[in-house]
Amino acid sequence: MSIQYTTVGDLKVGNYVVIDGEPCRVVEISKAKTGKHGSAKANIVAIGLFTGQKRTLMAPVDQQVEVPIIEKHIGQILADKGDTITIMDMENYETFDIEKPTDADIVDKIRPGAEVEYWEIMGRKKIVRVK
């Protein structure tokens, strides 16, 4: 798995974090200083990149969290198989199947021969946009 570590206090809106084994994009952060002897806590709300599910993380700001390393690639659509799409990577010409995205803007532009940008995150692949 391609991950690195950072502290909860260093996270900002728009960053990526792993919550419950799922890579997520941070959409909201609120920090609260507790009492005289307590350390500050952060409440992080994030949306899963693959599931779209809302996830929350409540942790001290000095706690280490996993941050996924996102590898961005360009590929060409070879075939639309209904639920999956066959893509060929433009750098190493490897072919593989990716689950069809649910975003209507992307689905409308999918056609054989079109170039797509896809992300590889923690061993999983996702189409982000069609060029």
From Swiss-Prot:
Instruction: Tell me the Gene Ontology biological-process terms attached to this UniProt entry.
Output: positive regulation of translational elongation; positive regulation of translational termination
Q: Which residues form a coiled coil?
A: none
Q: Which PROSITE patterns match?
A: IF5A_HYPUSINE
Against SUPFAM superfamilies, the record matches this protein to: Nucleic acid-binding proteins, Translation proteins SH3-like domain
Hypusine sites (modified residues): K36
Primary localisation category: cytoplasm
Subcellular location(s): the record lists: Cytoplasm
Recorded GO molecular functions are: ribosome binding; RNA binding; translation elongation factor activity; translation initiation factor activity
Under InterPro entries, the record lists: IF5A-like (IPR001884), IF5A-like_N (IPR048670), NA-bd_OB-fold (IPR012340), Rib_uL2_dom2 (IPR014722), Trans_elong_IF5A_hypusine_site (IPR019769), Transl_elong_IF5A_arc (IPR022847), Transl_elong_IF5A_C (IPR020189), Translation_prot_SH3-like_sf (IPR008991)
| Keywords recorded for this protein, A-Z | Cytoplasm, Hypusine, Initiation factor, Protein biosynthesis
Q: Which GO terms describe its cellular component?
A: cytoplasm
Gene3D superfamilies on file: 2.30.30.30, Nucleic acid-binding proteins (2.40.50.140)
Q: What does this protein do?
A: Functions by promoting the formation of the first peptide bond.
Q: Which family does it belong to?
A: Belongs to the eIF-5A family.
**What is the recorded name of this protein?**
Translation initiation factor 5A
Q: Which organism is it from?
A: Sulfurisphaera tokodaii (strain DSM 16993 / JCM 10545 / NBRC 100140 / 7) (Sulfolobus tokodaii)
Recorded name of the encoding gene:
eif5a
